[in-house]
Amino acid sequence: MKTVKMVLAALLVSASTHAFAANPVEFWGCKFADGYDMSDLMAHTEAFNKIVDDLPDRKYSAWIMTPFFSNNMSAVDFWWVGAWDSNTNMGGGFDEFLAAKDGAAWFAKYQAMSNCEVHTLMTSTNIRMASE
């Protein structure tokens, strides 16, 4: 019985590992342009969410992150981090967003509000999920 439990546990771990395939994660490290601050950005994210809510692709997650500790605390004011479940959905999501009625205008304002000198696309593989 112990062997059966071990095999089942191994299969579950294997299955859950395969469920978390490598996925694209985009990072924008940004400083606020003169006259803008976090309250402006958060208001702008409300407009972003309204645009994205009207798109057929629901495979995008996004976070605003602010430095809590860094070896260079003045490098960025915030990070915009976005993630998709696949490269295919990332490409489709970009196309849908920029083709949306207000998508390109939203992005132009985002660029006016911030100077994002850091723009990186990475592949992320989840190696551990938090337990309850």
Predicted regions and their residues:
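Non-heme di-metal
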Residues: 106-107
